[in-house]
Amino acid sequence: MKILVLNGSPKRKKSDTMHITRAFLDGMKEAAPQEVHIVDIIDKHIEYCTSCFACKRNGGKCIHNDDMKALLDEVLESNLLLFSYPLYCYGMPASLKAFADRTMPLSSMAMKKQGGRYVHVGQADFSHLKYMMICGCGFPNSKQNFEPAVMQFKLMFPNNHTIITVPESPMFNVPEAAEVTVRDWHSSSRLESSMLRQAK
C-alpha cells in the first residue's frame, strides 16, 4: 500500500501529532509492508487558490506554477492519504488548508446529487483512495474542540475515511509516555491496516 502523509505541523518532525502518526505508521508496517512518503507541507511552495476556476475549464491545469502539480500527481498514485496535523483555531493549519483548497483541479464545474447534497463531478479518478485524519490538541477535552475539523473532513471525504482525534497530544511525546504510545498506537494501527486490506 502506498501511503502519502501530509504533515500539516510547522514543527515538522518535532510535531506532537506527527509523533503519534509515526507510531501509527510503524504499527501498520508491522501488519503488512507499506510504502510511506511523509511530506512536510510547510516546506512546500503552495500558492493560495484564487478561485479563478481556470482548472475547471481547461481539464485540471492550475494557473500557479508551484509544488501542487507534483503533489496532486502523488495523491492520485497513492492508496491512502493521511492528514496529520495539530488543531489550529478548530481546524487545519494554514499551509495544509492551502493544500486542501488547491485540490480544486481534481473536480469539474459540473455537479451531481449525492445523498442529501450536491458535489462536483471529478476530473480525475480518485475512487481508489482512502483517507485518514490524525489530529491532536493540547486541551484535555475532545468536545467543543475537534467538531469543526471532524465535520470538514467528513464533508471533504464522505466515503472511505478514518478519523482519529487525540486530546492532550503533547503528553504522548514525552519519554515517559514512549511505551504507552508505541503499545497503544501500534495495536490500533495493525487493526486499521487489516481493515484497509479487507476493504480493497
Task: Give a label for each model feature.
Residues 40-42, 135, 167:
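Residues at the C-termini of beta-strands that transition into short coil/loop
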Residues 1-108, 174-175, 182-200:
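N-terminal beta1-alpha1-beta2 submodule of the flavodoxin-like/Rossmannoid cofactor-binding fold
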